[in-house]
């Protein structure tokens, strides 16, 4: 799975640092189909912040949203990730991350705009 491979590489590059993942699930159908896999992978990092699902034109599906994904991560780790709107995601990351942490953003939707907001760049 590409998420697991990416996070393994991050851990290998910075083994002594905490890893914080900000993840925006893409599509409700994919979130439904991959919820357990996503929860397993996200449970391997130190902290998780979730954005709401990027719907890509799909209607919501009961049980296939970021709140349910947060519950699944909490079942595995005992810590429930923060679920945030995309607009509030930079602030949620700032509240979660510490100096020296590696922050990784993942997702196929509008989360691509977040790294520039975190670094103060307007790109």
Model-derived segments and their meaning:
Residues 1-123:
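ATP-dependent carboxylate-amine ligase
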